[in-house]
Amino acid sequence: MVYGPHTQADRERMLATLGLDSVERLFDDIPPAVRAAGLDLPAPRSELELVRELQALAARNRVDLVSFLGAGVYRHHIPASVDAVISRGEFATAYTPYQPEISQGTLQTVFEFQSLIAELVGLPVVSASHYDGATATAEAALMAVRATRRQRVLISRAVHRHAVEATRTYVTSPSRDLAELPTLEDGSTDLAALEAALADPEHPVAAVIIGQPNAFGILEPMARAAELAHAAGALFVAVVEPVSLAVLAPPGEYGADIAAGDGQPLGIAPAYGGPSVGLLACSEALMRQIPGRLVGRTTDLDGRRAFVMTLRAREQDIRRDKAASNICTNQALCALAATTYLATLGPHGLGDVAATGAAMARRLEDALAGIGVQRVHGGAYLSELAVTVPGARDVHGALLERGILAGFELARWYPDDPRLRDALLLSCTELTTTPPPRRPIPSERPCPSPRAPRRAAGCRRRS
């Protein structure tokens, strides 16, 4: 196939075949009033001139900011091994590994991704990846609807708003609905409201969806919420932040049937909100309901270890109306980045990342309290906290001029909540390298310690 541009002789030959005397005649059907009069393109540049112009544009980017921005997308140190691995030509491809005999490397990396995420969340079945945390959460809701044959989903108001809206889009129909659960003064989900909603005999619930930590950074009573959901015959879905699982209990430990989350913190740099990788895991009882791809390990005819795609319940493989998902792709390269990141850090390294972010958040809270800035919510948190700052938008802009990215304005997500009108959500990670003046961390608010590595069912232990 020739990729060279058409020559003038080529164009004249095609126009002659069409019976036209100019290219402009091809657009005669477009009314002149809406037709472009011409393209105001700059003069051609040499490669050197173009590089200099792009460098000048790139120099306008602010990369020297002290950032407290999180709200679902987080800046972490990314080991050099991550880019080294994902840049290899064997992996940087759009090819789907349908032919296992020539795709063992790609299939093995997906299997390793599934194994590592299974160990992290404490659930045995993990999909090969999804677009992002929002679509993974929405798919979890549909899994629950199919498994329970119920038509109502309850989701906490404190789940990330992107996940809430994606789930609403997926779930809502004339026969199904999504209801939001309110939050308490401490920022956690109102379990009394949850219990009342579950007790409604007219609207049996398929799933209860709660985030850990939630969108305010608050730690939720997940075990109790799971207990209430199961008592009413509903499934419990935990929406998790993966780095936090190095120090918090995994979803499988407190009874979650499904875990969803966004894998961006695992070795993927923030870039205008993407790319990312959706995490979705479930119990063995729900294995047939999980959408997307699964990679399994088997043996070939010669008895050698082999990796293959298995249990493919996608619309490309079975009848569309029976398919578990109509998503026809995944985020394999981003999943490989997450795999490399986790393998490089190991459980204790990941625990250090989570614990450092938590310690920095407590130092930030103490420093802000010293100048009269208080938290919005009183609940326990890990490394993200909401604070009240009168005139938050103006303060945010003023600090940005001074090289400080002062978090996320929660009023953008909750415009009708007066408590959040002047609230900034501040996040700390190990890259919060310019901390406020240090104060002793009170003993009643200790920084979490990394939890001991756990081995999920069907997964190999990692060192």
Briefly describe each language-model feature range.
Residues R88-P100, L116-L123, T148-R149, V171-L181, ...:
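Gly-rich Lys/Arg/Thr-decorated short loops/hinges at beta-loop-alpha junctions or inter-strand turns
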Residues L266-I371, R375-G378:
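Active-site C-terminal subdomain of aminotransferase-like
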Residues M1-A36:
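Compact, charge-rich alpha-helical regulatory domains located at protein termini
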Residues V2, M14, T135-A306, G372, ...:
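Conserved PLP-enzyme active-site core in the AAT-like
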Residues A36-E112, I318:
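N-terminal entrance/gating region of PLP-dependent enzymes' catalytic architecture
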Residues Y98-I102, T106, E119-A138:
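Short loop-beta-helix segment that forms the pyridoxal 5′-phosphate
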Residues D10-A16, S115, D416-A452, R460-S463:
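PLP-dependent enzyme catalytic core of the Aspartate aminotransferase-like
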Residues H348-P435:
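Conserved C-terminal alpha-helix-loop-beta "cap" of PLP-dependent enzymes
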